[in-house]
């Protein structure tokens, strides 16, 4: 039995300076991290007779030890608090379940700059525009820019080794700076400047310069050039007319909040240079009994102050909640950014409309999320009843994909009580079996997955085997032979076979390979969750197989050529910009690749042609 925490003795040792505290349970796990302007005063509040909430009561009941870190300032304490939350993921803290850095558009500092998507640290020389809410928004913008301003987007390894322009040049989406004489340095630099102005929100300057160039071209009787610039002007105008634009200098993050049934949604609207770049909804993990104020305060702190997130701080943050520590947050963000950051909770005019939009989006996203969660919960409850299990907290499903026995890939997808856990999806490359032997493939993937130590929380309640009796027999055989420290009898093995016509709703389920199967009604919620996880597993397996097949397809031709090993294959593909570029190259161009002689270049050329 663990000793009772001696709060009185502990509080006598605590200072009244600012700092951070970490609370531990009997197992030595950090269960809560907090900050305080006055550590003694804040920590004393936990041990009063009348606590503020049940959540605090439950927390205090588990405390076995408290560590304190004193800081110079309250700002230091705030930064340290969020780094500790990130490190320990305490169960009584509100946790932001998002660890992705945001993507930017990168304009390189090369002689002929290129456009690309970028995530992570900004080490490369060049300019960064953003952040954008996701990769899709960046790719859409890059595709749009390519149509209006024909600046290259190819990798430098491709750009440096071209002797003829690529397809992008042929269709007018690149000026072809890789080949001398196709475009002047001045013209390319001008298009790069247009991109820079456009991404900075200075559309009017772009239009003014383009109009002046069009008029000059007309005066010089260069009508084809004037027509090309006219088309560019029209394209820029079409884009700017569709934009939701505020004041040209607006550089804001707008944060709306919705809270219902113990779940919170925080919706962030990203506005840069007056343009809405996009938005994103977050669903932080909220311990029971948490107040909305704590949710918002913790989310904002974690969102901006955790160093690994690579956030770009805007000049102003609009919040849909009046924080108690608003001044402290603004000071901490300003210190982090090296410039003044304003935090507003009661904006007017356009800013108030932005905040209303973020609030509406948060409410809509929360309703959708609650509906989805309710549906998956109902389906899992129904499946647990069918399988005579008390509950299903974790379920895993396996599928095999190949083409005529080649490039075999197995997939494992994971569902928990909230649905798909995509971060835990896995693919396994299958090797050393007879091509096309699905049973051997299933045997191999199950041994690799379960023939090792597994955390208690990650032992599945149900393992679904796609393929019917034969595959289920393999699973039973594997589990019978497993020698592992965890309870291998806990997972229920369930086989699922498609119906005679392979139509959804006609599936047959098996508990035993030699037993009779059973079917569920097509409208059964239990069947729907089985179909959901099976389809996820199928798609995941096919995706992995296609990638593997494409990789083999791109290198298999070269592998048959004598004298071309892995290093030379890699060098050829790198310098020629891929297999297609190599197929189109002449003998002389191939011979310029390091490590390729004239004789070998001729052999490669004729092998690829015939």
Curated annotation (Swiss-Prot):
Keywords: Cytoplasm, DNA damage, DNA excision, DNA repair, Excision nuclease, SOS response. It is found in: Cytoplasm. Residues 16-94 form the GIY-YIG domain. InterPro entries: GIY-YIG_endonuc (IPR000305), GIY-YIG_endonuc_sf (IPR035901), GIY-YIG_UvrC_Cho (IPR047296), Hlx-hairpin-Hlx_DNA-bd_motif (IPR003583), RuvA_2-like (IPR010994), UVR_dom (IPR001943), UVR_dom_sf (IPR036876), UvrABC_protein_C (IPR050066). GO terms for cellular component: cytoplasm; excinuclease repair complex. One of its GO terms (molecular function) is excinuclease ABC activity. Pfam families: GIY-YIG (PF01541), HHH_5 (PF14520), UVR (PF02151), UvrC_RNaseH (PF22920), UvrC_RNaseH_dom (PF08459). GO terms for biological process: nucleotide-excision repair; SOS response. Residues 204-239 form the UVR domain. Interacts with UvrB in an incision complex. Belongs to the UvrC family. PANTHER family: UVRABC SYSTEM PROTEIN C, UVRC/OXIDOREDUCTASE. The UvrABC repair system catalyzes the recognition and processing of DNA lesions. UvrC both incises the 5' and 3' sides of the lesion. The N-terminal half is responsible for the 3' incision and the C-terminal half is responsible for the 5' incision. This is UvrABC system protein C. It comes from Salmonella dublin (strain CT_02021853). The lineage of its organism: Bacteria, Pseudomonadati, Pseudomonadota, Gammaproteobacteria, Enterobacterales. The gene is uvrC.
């Amino acid at each position: 039995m663990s000793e009772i925490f001696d709060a009185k003795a502990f509080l006598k040792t605590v200072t009244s300076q600012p700092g951070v505290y970490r609370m531990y349970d009997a197992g030595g796990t950090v269960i809560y991290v907090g900050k305080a302007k006055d550590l003694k005063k804040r920590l004393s509040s936990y041990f009063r007779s009348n606590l503020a909430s049940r959540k605090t009561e439950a927390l205090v009941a588990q405390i076995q030890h408290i560590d304190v870190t004193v800081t110079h300032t309250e700002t230091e304490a705030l930064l340290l608090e969020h780094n500790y939350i990130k490190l320990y993921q305490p169960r009584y803290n509100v946790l932001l379940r998002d660890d992705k850095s945001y993507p930017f558009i990168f304009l390189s500092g090369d002689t002929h700059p290129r456009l690309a998507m970028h995530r992570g640290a900004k080490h490369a020389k060049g300019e960064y525009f953003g952040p954008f809410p996701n990769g899709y928004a960046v790719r859409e913008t890059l595709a749009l820019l390519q149509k209006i301003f024909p600046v290259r987007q190819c990798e430098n390894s491709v750009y440096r080794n071209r002797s003829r322009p690529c397809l992008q040049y042929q269709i007018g989406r690149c000026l072809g700076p890789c080949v001398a004489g196709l475009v002047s340095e001045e013209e390319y630099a001008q298009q790069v400047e247009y991109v820079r102005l456009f991404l900075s929100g200075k559309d009017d300057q772009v239009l003014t310069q383009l109009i002046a160039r069009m008029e000059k071209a007309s005066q010089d009787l260069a009508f084809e050039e004037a027509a090309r610039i006219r088309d560019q002007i029209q394209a820029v105008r079409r884009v700017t007319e569709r934009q939701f634009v505020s004041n040209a200098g607006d550089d804001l993050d707008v944060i709306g909040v919705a809270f219902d049934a113990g779940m919170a949604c925080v919706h962030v609207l990203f506005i840069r240079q007056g343009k809405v770049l996009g938005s994103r909804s977050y669903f932080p993990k909220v311990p029971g009994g948490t107040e909305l104020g704590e949710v918002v305060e913790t989310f904002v702190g974690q969102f901006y102050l955790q160093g690994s997130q690579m956030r770009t701080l805007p000049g102003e943050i609009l919040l849909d909640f009046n924080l108690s520590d608003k001044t402290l947050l603004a000071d901490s963000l300003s210190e982090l950014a090296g410039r003044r950051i304003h935090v507003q909770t009661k904006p007017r005019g356009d800013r108030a409309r932005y905040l209303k939009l973020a609030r509406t989006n948060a409410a809509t996203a929360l309703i959708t999320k609650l509906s989805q969660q309710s549906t998956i919960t109902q389906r899992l409850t129904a499946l647990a009843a069918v399988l005579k299990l008390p509950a299903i907290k974790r379920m895993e499903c396996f599928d095999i994909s190949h083409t005529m026995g080649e490039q075999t890939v197995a997939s494992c997808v994971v569902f928990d009580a909230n649905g798909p856990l995509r971060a835990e999806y896995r693919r396994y490359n299958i090797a050393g079996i007879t091509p096309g032997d699905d049973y051997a493939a299933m045997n191999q993937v199950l041994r690799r997955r379960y023939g090792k130590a597994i955390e208690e929380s990650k032992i599945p309640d149900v393992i679904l085997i796609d393929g019917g009796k034969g595959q289920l027999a393999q699973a039973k055989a594997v589990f019978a032979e497993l020698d592992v420290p965890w309870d291998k009898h806990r997972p229920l093995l369930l086989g699922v076979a498609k119906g005679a016509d392979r139509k959804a709703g006609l599936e047959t389920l098996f508990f035993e390979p030699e037993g009779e199967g059973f079917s569920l009604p097509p409208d059964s919620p239990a069947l729907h969750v089985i179909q959901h996880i099976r389809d996820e597993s199928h798609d995941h397996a096919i995706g992995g197989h296609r990638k593997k097949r494409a990789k083999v397809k791109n290198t298999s031709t070269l592998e048959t050529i004598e004298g071309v090993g892995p290093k030379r294959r890699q060098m050829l593909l790198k310098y020629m910009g891929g297999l297609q570029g190599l197929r189109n190259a002449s003998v002389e161009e191939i011979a310029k690749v390091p490590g390729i002689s004239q004789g070998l270049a001729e052999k490669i050329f004729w092998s690829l042609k015939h």
